[in-house]
């Protein structure tokens, strides 16, 4: 079958296929209405999670229309849809092939622990296998005879072939006097479940070798601040490495190319490096590759590390095998001047699925075939957005002379001169923005605003930039944003009298801080799931998370004592008197990362002080804006608020 036909089949599904009950935007009276860019970008992606089977013969993907979602499978050389399944009213997080005939889907829900267990509301993951051949769905149930367990997954699945059977390995929870981590296995086709290993330490991870045995176990003791790696020797788990770390703990991430060493990821001088640890004698080898890595790429069947990525904004892929690197270089040549990200690949690396973003192909999924050296666009991620707004790399000097890199999205068809501006700081704060496609700045640009996304100090672009953020929460991390406004105004790119700040999570905090701690820059603010009271947030974190999590936050906030007055110094709620512009707060009722009360108390305090404030509650929404309806609700409320207080035209 020609690759063009494959693309047209996917396009037909995206436009509305009468399969699986006819998931389509079309109503009973005719064709689907024409949607605005805001409506398109506020919805979940039309096409996502495009993955190729290990043998390279089948494609699976998720198609969305409104809140209706379905997983489809099509096969090379055959017409129509091989099979498909509707996704129920749940949050589908990911799909992946576990062998040539079975897909593993990860779903989540926000809830309290099961009856009889104590703990806060959290996002619980569960896994479901979709048997493509039999068209049946099998939930992975962690039910062990004579052992109480919770039916949740606590990490990513690993898949191995053992005695010609597919075995899925998933970390989960078992119960003694409390819930504790364990490693479970599920053997197909009967889904027989076993509890392979138990741990009495909450922070535990495992590595599974090619034969399906536990090869290594990592543990971290939070109160003692000690870590240990154990490997299997002569049928027993033996300690081969240990150390201390108060925050930057190591991780075991896979195996070396020959399987003789465990690969551990370490933070050294702020950089992440990969070190091989011999399972034979516990000796450390020279770091893999050159430089530091971001993302690990493993061989599906063995867990051996075959490559990784360098860089944050400009992500570069490195493969340790020359032939694989040649395949990847061919992919890059097929998409010159475009951003290319690896999504999925066949085991022999002959067929590769990528996301591409650029002027020629917009934001799309594509298939590259090594044997034909042909690339085919499979479909747009957001159907109807074929020409996204242009993203420019910019940089400026902060007040203390530090160079800050940022990205400026400019409304399509407008000259970069005297534009209204939205400053959109990222969450984290140890995260980073890039010139990749992002639905939020694209949505704001579609309304006529330029959008500035600075990688302020604390962003994880470089180790030096991360460390520069320690102790600067609400301080230089905040003025790095307004320094960008001043620089663009000096150049004449934006109108300094028409600037607002918008953000979510830490970015939501930055939005509130921008109009309280750094007043006079912004004429309005939109805070989505933002932190308003740092002392209350710190107390909540202490009650609901491990000490290492608290130490992580304290390092950025510059806090060494929970009674430190610095918490009030950088809390927006304690500086409402300085606020003289309107604020919109938006918060998901099911948020388990930043409590909903953080917005409630800020709204109440602002109302009491007579400050202009609006509040939008997103019912049944979590911290990540996971559903299309509430994401659109947030965008529409924000757009109306911005238009009223900082009109673009």
List where the protein language model places each region.
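Bacterial N-terminal signal peptides
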Residues: 11-21
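Non-catalytic accessory segments flanking enzyme active sites
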Residues: 205-207, 317-413, 439-442, 446-447, ...
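Beta-propeller folds
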Residues: 26-352, 359-361
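Bacterial N-terminal signal peptides that target proteins for export
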Residues: 2-11
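Glycine-rich His-Gly loop
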Residues: 357, 424-428, 588
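Conserved hydrophobic/aromatic "anchor" residues
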Residues: 52, 61, 97, 255, ...
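Active-site-proximal cap/loop segments of hydrolase catalytic domains
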Residues: 456-649
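Cap/lid segment of the alpha/beta-hydrolase catalytic domain
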Residues: 385-497, 504-505, 539
């Amino acid at each position: 079958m020609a690759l063009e036909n494959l693309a047209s089949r996917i396009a037909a599904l995206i436009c509305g296929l009468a399969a699986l009950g006819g998931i389509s935007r079309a109503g009973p009276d005719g064709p689907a209405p024409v949607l605005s860019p805001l409506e398109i970008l506020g919805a979940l992606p039309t096409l996502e999670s495009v993955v190729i089977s290990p043998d390279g013969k089948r494609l699976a993907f998720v198609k969305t229309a409104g809140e209706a979602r379905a997983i489809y499978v099509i096969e090379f050389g055959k017409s129509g849809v091989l099979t498909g399944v509707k996704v129920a009213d749940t949050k589908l997080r990911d799909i992946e092939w576990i062998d040539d005939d079975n897909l593993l889907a990860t779903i989540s829900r926000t809830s309290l622990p099961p009856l009889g267990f104590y703990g806060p509301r959290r996002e619980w993951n569960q896994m479901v296998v979709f048997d493509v051949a039999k068209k049946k769905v099998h939930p992975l149930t962690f039910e062990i005879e004579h052992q109480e367990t919770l039916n949740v997954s606590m990490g990513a699945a690993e898949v191995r072939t053992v005695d010609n059977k597919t075995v899925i390995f998933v970390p989960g929870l078992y119960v003694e006097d409390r819930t504790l981590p364990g490693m479970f296995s599920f053997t197909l086709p009967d889904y027989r479940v076993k509890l392979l290993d138990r741990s009495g330490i909450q922070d535990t991870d495992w590595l599974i070798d090619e034969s399906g045995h536990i090869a290594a176990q990592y543990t971290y003791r939070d109160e003692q601040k000690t870590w240990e790696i154990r490997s299997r020797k002569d049928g027993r788990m033996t300690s081969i490495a240990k150390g201390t770390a108060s925050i930057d703990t190591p991780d075991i991430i896979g195996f070396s190319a020959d399987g003789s060493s465990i690969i551990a990821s370490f933070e050294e001088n702020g950089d992440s490096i990969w070190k091989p640890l011999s399972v034979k004698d516990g000796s450390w080898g020279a770091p893999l590759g050159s430089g530091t890595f971001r993302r690990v790429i493993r061989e599906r069947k063995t867990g051996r590390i075959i490559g990784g990525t360098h860089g944050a904004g400009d992500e570069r892929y490195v493969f340790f095998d020359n032939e694989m690197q040649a395949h990847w270089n061919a992919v890059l040549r097929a998409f010159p001047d475009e951003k290319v990200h690896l999504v999925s690949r066949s085991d022999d690396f002959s067929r590769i699925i990528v996301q591409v973003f650029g002027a020629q192909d917009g934001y799309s999924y594509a298939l590259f075939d090594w044997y034909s050296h042909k690339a085919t666009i499979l479909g747009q991620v957001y159907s109807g957005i074929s020409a996204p707004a242009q993203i420019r790399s910019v940089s400026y000097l902060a007040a203390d002379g530090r160079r800050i890199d940022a990205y400026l999205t400019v409304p399509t068809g407008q000259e970069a001169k005297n534009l209204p501006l939205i400053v959109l700081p990222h969450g984290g704060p140890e995260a980073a923005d890039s010139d990749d496609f992002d639905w939020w700045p694209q949505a704001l640009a579609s309304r006529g605003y330029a959008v500035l996304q600075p990688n302020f100090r604390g962003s994880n672009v470089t180790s030096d930039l991360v460390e520069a953020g320690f102790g600067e929460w609400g301080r230089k991390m905040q003025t790095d944003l307004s320094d960008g406004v001043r620089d663009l105004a000096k150049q004449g790119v934006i109108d300094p009298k028409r600037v607002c700040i918008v953000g979510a999570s830490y970015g939501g905090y930055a939005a509130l801080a921008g109009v309280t701690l750094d007043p006079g820059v912004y004429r309005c603010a939109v805070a989505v799931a933002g932190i308003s009271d740092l002392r209350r947030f710190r107390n909540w974190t202490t009650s609901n998370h491990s000490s290492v999590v608290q130490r992580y936050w304290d390092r950025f906030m510059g806090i060494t004592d929970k009674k430190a007055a610095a918490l009030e110094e950088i809390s927006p709620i304690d500086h409402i008197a300085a606020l003289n512009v309107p604020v919109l707060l938006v918060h998901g009722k099911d948020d388990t990362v930043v409590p909903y009360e953080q917005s409630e108390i800020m709204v109440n305090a602002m109302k009491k002080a007579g400050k202009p404030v609006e509040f939008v509650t997103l019912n049944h929404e979590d911290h990540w804006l996971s559903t299309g309806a509430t994401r659109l609700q947030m965008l529409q409320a924000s757009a109306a608020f911005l238009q009223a207080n900082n009109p673009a035209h």
